[in-house]
UniProtKB/Swiss-Prot annotation:
Protein name, UniProt field: Regulator of rDNA transcription protein 1
Gene it is expressed from: RRT1
Broad class of where this protein is predominantly found: membrane
Subcellular location: Membrane
Record keywords, A-Z: Membrane, Transmembrane, Transmembrane helix
Species assigned in the record: Saccharomyces cerevisiae (strain ATCC 204508 / S288c)
Main function: Identified in a screen for mutants with decreased levels of rDNA transcription.
Amino acid sequence: MILFKNLVFLPSILIGYISIRVSLLVWVNWVLVWSSCFQVAFIFSLWYFILSIYTFFYSKKIKQIISYEPSYFVFSYRAIDLCPERVLLYFFCIFNNVVFPML
């Protein structure tokens, strides 16, 4: 019964997770392209895509969702934003906007 309940909720959580990633990627690329930073937009897309795949398969939060712990569903969906990917993403944005132009 627990397995069935979790299999019902898992697709909606994964769809929400993927849609958050895609919407942010599209928005940031739109800003970068309109500011004529085509190379930065391409590098950002590639970097963000790799980080998303890494987070999806290796993040402890995602593993806990897939391990069928029903009481963890709501917390896991909220805790996705606390993944190490966010820290790397912020670092990458700072590097692109501050350090990269000075090189």
